[in-house]
Regions:
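Short amphipathic alpha-helical interaction segments
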Residues: 50-65, 136-148
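Sec/Tat signal peptide C-region and signal peptidase I cleavage site
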Residues: 16-23
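Short, amphipathic alpha-helical interaction segments positioned at domain boundaries
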Residues: 83-115, 175-203
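Short acidic, hydrophobic short linear motifs in intrinsically disordered regions
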Residues: 34-48, 115-131, 219
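A short, conserved structural fragment
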Residues: 64-75, 154-162
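A cross-kingdom marker for long, charged
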Residues: 227-272
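Bacterial N-terminal signal peptides
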Residues: 6-15
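Positively charged n-region of N-terminal signal peptides that target proteins for export
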Residues: 1-5
Length: 272
């Protein structure tokens, strides 16, 4: 399988005509934001980013030297000793400072009567708005919106937070400027820090509960893992949803579109 993956990488690099990566990003950094998973989809992205097949070959050989490396289907998941899984690093054409975002964000007291203080985004409304203002079709609007969510969840400018598992937030909450002046801000920031600190361990442990092409990710056991990994310090009952959105927006799901959620790929799952 390793040989096939290397051949695929060579072909892809030839097609793109680029063998030089960005000077400030190593291959390991790049793969880390792809879930430390080397396979068909990430090879395409690595080639587009200018990472050469020699570096990919060397990384796979390094992984071959440890029993911790996971091989599943056409994928290789590098061990934590070589690569730590980070939240997906993606960038959307929709920016949090764009006028469409501002127009579809509530006032900070817009949901006060319901007990929620914060600036909440009308996500479906935003997807409809950018189709009009930018001439995008539904699939392009969905792609950029999911990337927008993943990007800003990663930076901490968005959250989907409540400490009550029986309560659903009004929407994604913007946490910039005056919108960050909310009673739960310290708890939100702590939950974000815990999520990112434990991201590698949570993704790797949960993958054992998810069969690629059949199951959903994260699994129903994810929040139990969060409780154990954070020793009960996490207060966000919806961390599982944040992680799902981050991985979908980061391209860790195959076949996502405006009408289809798609299915997870490694490192989120294992093939039978």
């Amino acid at each position: 399988m390793r040989t096939l993956i290397i051949i695929a990488a060579i072909c892809l690099l030839t097609a793109t005509g680029s063998g030089r990566a960005a000077a400030n990003e190593t291959l390991t950094d790049f793969i880390s934001a792809q879930g430390c998973a080397i396979g068909p989809a990430t090879l395409v992205r690595a080639a587009e980013a200018g990472h050469g097949h020699d570096a990919i070959d060397a990384l796979i050989k390094q992984a071959d030297a440890t029993d911790e490396t996971i091989r599943t289907g056409d994928w290789i998941v590098l061990p934590s000793s070589i690569c730590r899984i980070q939240p997906p690093d993606v960038h959307s054409k929709i920016q949090i400072t764009d006028p469409e975002v501002a127009a579809l964000t509530s006032d900070i007291d817009g949901y006060a009567k319901l007990g929620d203080r914060g600036c909440f985004l009308d996500g479906p409304g935003l997807m409809e708005r950018v189709q009009v203002t930018r001439g995008w079709d539904r699939n392009r609007a969905n792609l950029e919106y999911m990337r927008f969510l993943a990007e800003n969840l990663r930076t901490g400018d968005l959250a989907f937070y409540t400490n009550d598992p029986l309560s659903t937030p009004p929407g994604f909450q913007i946490l910039r400027g005056d919108c960050a002046d909310v009673p739960e801000i310290d708890a939100i920031r702590q939950s974000q820090a815990l999520r990112d600190r434990e991201f590698d361990a949570l993704i790797r442990e949960d993958a054992a509960n998810v069969i690629c092409g059949r199951d959903d990710s994260p699994s129903y056991r994810f929040m139990d893992l969060v409780m154990r990994r954070t020793r009960g310090e996490n207060t966000n009952a919806w961390m599982v949803f944040e992680v799902k959105i981050m991985t979908i927006g980061g391209g860790w799901y195959v076949g996502n579109s405006a009408t289809q959620k798609g299915t997870p790929r490694p490192p989120l799952c294992r093939f039978q």
